[in-house]
Amino acid sequence: TVSHATAIEAALLGRMGLAELGEKTLGPLAMEHGAQLKANHTLDLCRAALMFEGIEAPRGREEMVKAALSTYSLPTALGNLANKVLLDAYTESPATWRAFCAIRSTSDFKKNTAIRPSFTTPLERVGTDGELKHGTVGEWFSEYQVDTFGKMLSIDRRDLINDDLSVFDETARALGRAAMRRVSDLVYEVLLANAGNFFSAGNGNYLTGADSALSFDGLAKAIEAMMLQRDDEGNDLDLRPATLLVPPQLQTTAKALLESEFIQQIVERTPTGNSLRRAVSVEIEPRLSNTEKFGNKASAKHWYLFASPSAVPMVVAFLEGKQTPTVEYFGLDHQANKLAVTWRVYHDFGTALVDPRAAVRSKGEA
């Protein structure tokens, strides 16, 4: 069976030209029930919400809208609609950080510790007595904390009276995109800040000088630096580079390095096979060179190499594992000075640098 609120939600999706999203999230049966309401105007859905609850619809438009927004069905449908549209925009927004950040769940807003154990002694041959020797475990750790980020979303009663749901759609989508942008902003703010000299010569993960520019030799050097990372006792960590992260200014160079079948040798000036072809995937991130937002920490020349998220170069944590924003309904009377229904949109997340051995930064210039 399809609930009254779901039928109204399906009809709203149809009215907004989002039938495909409705089919995907509610299913064909719900969309069919929505179509059966034959809603040619948003006021028809207000009337349906009142009818579902056995309330006679007032004759005046404003009175009808106000009465409908006091029912269960219409506010629930609008809230679910806001959630779906917002999350649709959120999931479609670029998130380059997912290529190299481990995802974690935290149960509170306290400081949490991201620990990456490092077994500093290899497995040893078991003797005839069957005794297994104890090894030692070292740890790389970093602290992270989840914070709350949010905004309010409102739909004025006049938009319902005027059958104008485009503002609602555009606002919800804008909030969805803004939510993902805020996560990305925080990730790259932390990455570029380089707290605790995460990228440094001492950690073997920071390349400088003219030969650190993105080139065949520069990328080969970064790959080598990561693959040569060892623990405190000299054991190889077997890290494998997975993602090359570059600003838009370096995307052509990056794609040429990783996609071309041949490269031009400088000395002989003859093409030769490209041994770096498809060595890693490439991600283009405009925040890396956004000096307006990140000041002199941003650059059009620097670039990064990361191992896979399982190696935990960085962590992004979400409260109780909820990776998407939360949408809460507040009703028509939430603000006495404003005749509008309001939703609160908020997102709880945090991020931190964790294991410097799983990342390399190249300055890209002398």
Predicted regions and their residues:
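A glycine-rich phosphate-binding loop feature that marks nucleotide/adenosyl-phosphate handling sites
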Residues: 192-196, 240-247
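A conserved ligand/cofactor-binding region detector
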Residues: 35-50, 61-68, 72-75, 79-81, ...
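Intrinsically disordered, low-complexity terminal tails
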Residues: 1-72, 359-366
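Alpha-helical scaffold segments that mediate packing/assembly in large oligomeric complexes
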Residues: 151, 155-230, 275, 283-287
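Assembly/oligomerization interface modules of large self-assembling protein complexes
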Residues: 63-149
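Sequence/fold signature of self-assembling virion shell proteins
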Residues: 209-213, 217-228, 242-243, 249-366
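Short amphipathic alpha-helical segments
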Residues: 149-151, 242
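Short gly/pro-enriched beta-turn/loop segments at secondary-structure junctions
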Residues: 232, 237-241
